[in-house]
Amino acid sequence: MQPLPTVKEKAEPVPDDRWQELTDVECHTLLAERHLGRLTLTDPDGPVIFPVNYALDEGTVVVRTDPGSKLDAIAGGARVAFEVDAVDEGSRTGWSVVVRGQAAEVCEPADLDRLHGLPPYPWAPGAKARYVRIRPVSVSGRPIAMPANLPFTWWG
């Protein structure tokens, strides 16, 4: 599997020093461990987010879908964002990885045959026999760790 491109080669504190960037390897490892993410795109009504199952394939993110809003919105190679995360509210820890790139429907028969056998299989009902491929332009991530002595709300 080819690695996805990332913004940072190693973890570095950001100016606020409460946030750090995940390394290239950390981002790829976390993406490979999960199978549910959020595809963000723009349709005629504006930005929309879809929870989707996904697989990694040759350095890209692949999402199975049915004809409809996702395919309509990515026609012509739309720019999209794809986010995967994990959060433990009890410990106030977690992480988030964001992939930014171009999305297009997969149409090549050889690619479709290979992708059809990739897990995970969609949780949502429907055939989900169409595929959207996201070719990353950048991948970035950050750990989430909130000090235990801070309140859950930022305004209080």
Describe every region a protein language model picked out.
Residues 1-32, 153:
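Extreme N-terminal tail/first-helix region
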Residues 45, 69-71, 148:
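Short, surface-exposed beta-strand-loop junctions and turns on beta-sheet-rich folds
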Residues 1-13, 51-56, 84-89:
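N-terminal short leaders/motifs
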Residues 53-56, 102, 148:
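A short, sequence-level motif marking secondary-structure junctions
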Residues 143-156:
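Short, charged, intrinsically disordered terminal tails
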Residues 60-62, 133, 140:
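General beta-strand recognition
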Residues 34-66, 82:
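Short beta-strand segments
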Residues 67-130, 136-138:
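Short, structured beta-strand-loop surface elements
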